[in-house]
């Protein structure tokens, strides 16, 4: 109901300003501080005071007097507090909120008939997913989920670098070395088995005999040239390596979970001629220059030129990515790319080049993120191999299992078997990792800390998940169904009304997170909702209340369960039914 109330306030405020012959372009609507009883407030009096020639509180009073609250559905009264115009909620606002929050799809917005492609992760298929890159799939998947909740038609893409030097080295190494000469894989999974070839190949290229290195480099260059020339046999050789490694990486990413609708390969835009066509168009631009044995764009706003073609006629990653983006613009209404902060220059140059090629770059938005660090000694890892995402997730599950088992009382333990405990440990452990990462502003660097991520008493995934499990436990103890139209009248306690207000905000939180591409604000909302529910739970007995109050409070519990489940789902975090 929050969105409906906001729309009603916008219309009423605009009409009042028009009546007073005042401009209504900027209404200054905002959520007031917690100690103000209003749901929404307007600071428009600040803006208009100079034009009217009187103090802001006087302007606010005139505006409030021009609004007939009796004609509104979701607003009961319009008051002022200094320069602010406050809009108080009506009983209809609370009643319709109580009814809507128990619907399973609460928080999902109407279809916008707008297609969006979200490209994220796109790590080179050269081995296991490293923990340092874990923020990309977590943020990217959450952005896609929030957009989906907001009514967009979303596709999730992984852009596969299958045409660069690293892949050519990998292909040469895979075809050259005997598996018997390689160390045992760290895990029985395709990417762990294949990366052994890649590591040995790089060792040879860095430290090998000069003649051996020269022969290897010639083969690597031959593979790159074969891709550029459209040689089908070369494509097949490369695809065998890429697809095998990518299959294993998918399994790891699926644990988060981060799933994809399509894996779009760079070579697609070489094979279909798009890259060659793009190169011809780039050469025709006024800022195109041939310098230092390469074709480049001398972009006026950048100190560094954008190289798009080497002297030997081979294209670069950025060249193929330009063709990739033009394909996205032709296929989708909007395109979102999630990138590490070290790619910002490349992304800005790409956008500038796309604009020079007459593309509408308003279709394109980027989400940049900083890195995830682990505290010294924070992980047990294999010597010399670094920390892979699988390592982090395994340890998260192990630590979560210890925490869950330590919190089980005799009654709960008797209700759960080992499979249940394994399930809860996975939900809590992986949820803790994902939530801890997605809950931070992407541009801020973070250090992942186990104690914080798995703290059941603090602002963490387990804290929010536990509220969902508690709601499920309460509802599991009753045999009657929640009424389709629960009665609001018994809900008069401040904690009950506070909980209704918080629940009502969820659709607006989704809308804002989708507009701004900020899923971390949904995580903030889940913590606020969990805290508000806990205050309600402490002060308002549910099962021991009189029948009418019990039924109404059960509806509140059911609404909280639904809202937390959907909010966590929008973040890609599971909501356990027991913990």
Swiss-Prot record:
GO BP, sorted A to Z: arginyl-tRNA aminoacylation
A Pfam family recorded for this sequence: Arg_tRNA_synt_N
InterPro entries linked: Arg-tRNA-ligase (IPR001278), Arg-tRNA-synth_N (IPR005148), Arg-tRNA-synth_N_sf (IPR036695), ArgRS_core (IPR035684), DALR_anticod-bd (IPR008909), Rossmann-like_a/b/a_fold (IPR014729), tRNAsynth_Ia_anticodon-bd (IPR009080)
Top-level EC class as recorded in UniProt: ligase
Record keywords: Aminoacyl-tRNA synthetase, ATP-binding, Cytoplasm, Ligase, Nucleotide-binding, Protein biosynthesis
SUPFAM superfamilies cross-referenced by the UniProt entry: Anticodon-binding domain of a subclass of class I aminoacyl-tRNA synthetases, Arginyl-tRNA synthetase (ArgRS), N-terminal 'additional' domain, Nucleotidylyl transferase
Catalyzed reactions: tRNA(Arg) + L-arginine + ATP = L-arginyl-tRNA(Arg) + AMP + diphosphate
Motif ('HIGH' region): 123-133
Location(s), subcellular: Cytoplasm
GO terms under cellular component: cytoplasm
NCBIfam families, alphabetized: argS (TIGR00456)
Protein family per UniProt: Belongs to the class-I aminoacyl-tRNA synthetase family.
Name recorded for this polypeptide: Arginine--tRNA ligase
Origin species: Haloarcula marismortui (strain ATCC 43049 / DSM 3752 / JCM 8966 / VKM B-1809) (Halobacterium marismortui)
Lineage: Archaea, Methanobacteriati, Methanobacteriota, Stenosarchaea group, Halobacteria
């Amino acid at each position: 109901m929050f969105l409906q109330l906001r729309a009603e306030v916008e219309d009423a405020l605009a009409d009042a300003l028009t009546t007073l012959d005042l401009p209504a372009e900027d209404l200054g609507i905002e959520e007031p501080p917690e100690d103000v009883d209003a749901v929404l407030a307007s600071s428009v009096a600040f803006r208009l005071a100079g034009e009217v020639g009187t103090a802001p509180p006087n302007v606010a009073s005139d505006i409030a007097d021009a609004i007939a609250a009796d004609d509104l559905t979701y607003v009961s009264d319009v008051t002022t507090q200094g320069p602010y115009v406050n809009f108080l909620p009506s009983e209809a606002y609370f009643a319709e909120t109580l009814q809507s929050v128990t619907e399973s799809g609460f928080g999902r917005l109407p279809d916008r008939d707008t297609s969006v492609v979200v490209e994220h992760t796109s790590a080179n298929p050269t081995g296991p997913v490293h923990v340092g890159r874990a923020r990309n799939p977590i943020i990217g998947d959450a952005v896609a989920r929030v957009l989906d909740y907001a009514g967009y038609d979303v596709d999730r893409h992984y852009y596969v670098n299958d045409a660069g030097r690293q892949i050519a080295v990998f292909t040469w190494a895979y075809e050259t070395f005997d598996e018997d000469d390689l160390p045992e894989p760290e895990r029985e999974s395709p990417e762990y088995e294949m990366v052994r070839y890649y590591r040995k190949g790089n060792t040879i290229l860095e430290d090998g005999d000069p003649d051996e290195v020269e022969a290897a480099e010639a083969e690597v260059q031959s593979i790159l040239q074969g891709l550029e020339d459209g040689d089908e046999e070369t494509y097949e050789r490369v695809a065998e390596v890429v697809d095998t490694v990518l299959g294993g990486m998918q399994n790891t990413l699926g644990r988060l979970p981060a799933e994809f609708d399509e894996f779009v390969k760079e070579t697609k835009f070489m094979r279909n001629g798009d890259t060659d066509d793009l190169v011809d168009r780039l050469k025709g631009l006024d800022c195109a220059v041939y310098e230092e044995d390469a074709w480049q764009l001398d972009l006026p706003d950048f100190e560094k030129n954008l190289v798009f073609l080497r002297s030997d006629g081979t294209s670069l990653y950025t060249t193929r990515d330009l063709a990739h983006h033009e394909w996205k613009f032709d296929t989708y209404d909007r395109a979102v790319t999630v990138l590490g902060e070290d790619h910002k220059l490349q992304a800005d140059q790409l956008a500038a080049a796309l604009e020079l090629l007459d593309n509408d770059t308003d279709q394109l938005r980027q989400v940049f993120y900083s890195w995830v660090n682990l505290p010294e000694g924070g992980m047990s890892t294999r010597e010399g191999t670094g920390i892979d995402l699988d390592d982090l997730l395994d340890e998260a599950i192990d630590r979560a299992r210890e925490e869950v088992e330590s919190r089980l009382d005799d009654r709960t333990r008797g209700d759960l078997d080992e499979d249940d405990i394994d399930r809860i440990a996975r939900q809590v452990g992986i949820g803790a990792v994902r939530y801890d990462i997605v809950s931070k502003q992407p541009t801020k660097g973070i250090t992942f800390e186990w104690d914080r991520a798995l703290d059941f008493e603090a602002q963490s995934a387990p804290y929010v998940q536990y509220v969902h499990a508690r709601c499920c436990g309460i509802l599991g103890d009753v045999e009657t169904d929640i009424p389709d139209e629960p009665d609001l009248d018994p809900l008069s306690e401040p904690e009950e009304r506070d909980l209704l207000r918080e629940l009502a905000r969820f659709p607006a939180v989704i809308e804002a997170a989708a507009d701004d591409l900020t899923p971390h604000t949904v995580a903030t909302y889940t913590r606020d909702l969990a805290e508000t529910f806990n205050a309600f739970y402490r002060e308002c007995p549910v099962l021991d209340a009189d029948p009418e109050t019990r039924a109404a409070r059960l509806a509140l519990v059911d609404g909280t369960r639904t809202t937390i489940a959907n909010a966590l789902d929008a973040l890609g975090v599971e909501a356990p039914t027991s913990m």
